[in-house]
């Protein structure tokens, strides 16, 4: 019942673009979740991440489980394709990927600009998340969906093209030269 009060206070994230101010911050959203969600749902809420661990951890939320699987597979497909492009080996535990996911990963790997590749991947992630959107807009699963969508929108807004390009070049040069100096910087 409490999620009704929570969700009714949330502004819509639909139609938000890069120039539109966000109607809510992660901090405010977290405050509302801590206030209205039960302990079990709060535990699941704390496990929402844009970077799930490589080895899957069982969660009770179907939405979070599907998100984690999709994001993990996307990251593994990207790593595999990037490694192939550089002539390196990559251990992916004989992972098989869907055709759509592989096509998205191939497209992202072929985009020259890292910033444009990230924008493409962010759109792919938002589209994937939309396929997971719960039918019941007043459920705990919808709260988790909303949290993931807010995190994705905030993530792309944090990108700074100039510093990102410099960091990318540093890491790329380090990898191509076979050293690990990017880790210490």
Residue ranges and their predicted role:
Residues 1-185:
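Extended alpha-helical surfaces
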């Amino acid at each position: 019942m409490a999620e009704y009060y929570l969700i009714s206070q949330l502004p819509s994230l639909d139609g938000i673009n890069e120039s539109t101010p966000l109607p809510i911050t992660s901090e405010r959203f977290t405050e509302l979740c801590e206030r209205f969600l039960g302990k079990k749902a709060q535990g699941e809420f704390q496990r929402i991440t844009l970077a799930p661990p490589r080895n899957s951890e069982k969660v009770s939320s179907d939405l979070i489980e599907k998100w984690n699987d999709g994001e993990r597979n996307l990251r593994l497909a990207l790593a595999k394709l990037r490694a192939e492009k550089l002539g390196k080996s990559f251990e992916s535990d004989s992972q098989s990927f869907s055709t759509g996911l592989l096509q998205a990963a191939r497209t992202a790997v072929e985009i020259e600009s890292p910033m444009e590749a990230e924008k493409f991947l962010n759109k792919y992630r938002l589209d994937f998340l939309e396929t997971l959107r719960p039918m019941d807009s007043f459920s705990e699963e919808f709260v988790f969906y909303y949290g993931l969508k807010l995190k994705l929108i905030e993530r792309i807004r944090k990108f700074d093209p100039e510093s990102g390009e410099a960091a990318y070049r540093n890491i790329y040069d380090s990898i191509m030269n076979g050293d690990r100096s990017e880790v210490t910087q």
